[in-house]
A protein has these predicted regions:
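Short, exposed coil/turn segments at beta-strand boundaries within extracellular/luminal domains
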Residues: 14-21, 103-111, 192-199
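Short proline/glycine-enriched turn/loop motifs at strand-loop junctions of beta-rich domains
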Residues: 58-64, 121, 147-153, 210
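Extracellular/luminal low-complexity segments enriched in Ser/Thr/Pro
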Residues: 1-3, 84-93, 173-182
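Low-complexity "stalk/linker" and mucin-like segments enriched in Ser/Thr/Pro/Ala/Gly
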Residues: 47, 65-86, 134-136, 154-172
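A short beta-strand segment in extracellular, disulfide-stabilized domains
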Residues: 49-58, 138-147, 223
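Proline-enriched interdomain boundary motifs that mark the N-terminal boundary
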Residues: 31-40, 120-129, 208-217
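Interdomain boundary/hinge segments at the C-termini of tandem beta-sandwich modules
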Residues: 24-30, 114-119, 202-208
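A short beta-strand micro-motif common to beta-rich folds, especially ectodomain repeats
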Residues: 5-14, 94-104, 183-193
Length: 223
């Protein structure tokens, strides 16, 4: 089963002026190997328009051709059969499967490479919207945001607010305001993920506390 070299068969005919011989040469071609992708069996990429070449090799092959799964083709992606070059369209996310088929003796032999295309992270959206207002005073307010396809969101506070004694918890968006702080505070949410990070701001107007009413004539008068 493992023989893959040259065999020579010699026929010898006995008789007058013999023997007479002739030979027959048999070339035993090795069995084609299973293709192996240079990128391995799987890979991950971010959603976006791009061309990626998926090369495979195989022992004793007379040539390798490549195909792409039907769902990927249906979404507008294409493949060059001779090279394994896949052209991804901008809107595609999901799984693409490239199949390499190696021609040769006892072939073809095939192998697949699966690509997970991760969607682009969305722009964060604050639960409170783009802006809000509050009255001056010491308290803590949490400003949360969500983003599609995000692997995590972190929060930061503008430099002026930090200098004014206010603080923020970067993992939660919880802002602790100093009692004396007035003016604008800007909370920035940064969403991690494919083709990210993506950011959005929430602006808080911190209004002055209204002062006590004072009569021009004082607290009391006589008439």
């Amino acid at each position: 089963a493992s023989w893959n070299e040259t065999s020579i068969i010699t026929a010898s005919a006995n008789g007058c002026n013999g023997p007479s011989t002739s030979t027959h040469t048999v070339t035993t071609t090795p069995t084609v190997g299973t293709p192996s992708f240079i990128a391995g069996a799987t890979s991950i990429r971010c959603q976006g328009a791009e061309t990626v070449v998926y090369d495979a090799t195989a022992a004793y092959t007379t040539g390798i051709t490549y195909t792409l799964n039907a769902a990927s083709l249906g979404a507008g992606n294409t493949i060059v059969a001779a090279t394994g070059s896949v052209n991804y369209v901008a809107g595609w996310s999901g799984t693409s499967t490239i199949t390499a088929s190696a021609a040769g003796c006892n072939g073809p032999k095939t192998a697949v490479h699966s690509v997970t295309i991760t969607p682009t992270v969305g722009t964060p959206v604050f639960a409170f919207g783009a802006a809000s207002a509050r009255c001056q005073g010491a308290n803590t307010v949490t400003y949360t945001a969500g983003a599609t396809n995000s692997t995590g969101i972190t929060y930061s506070l503008d430099a002026a607010s930090i200098s004014g004694g206010n603080t923020i918890v970067s993992t939660t968006g919880a802002v602790t305001y100093d009692a004396a702080w007035t003016g604008a505070s800007v909370i920035t949410a940064s969403a991690s993920g494919c083709n990210g990070p993506k950011t959005a701001d929430h602006t808080v107007t911190n209004n002055l506390t209204v002062g006590a009413t004072t009569f021009a004539m004082g607290a009391s008068s006589t008439r």
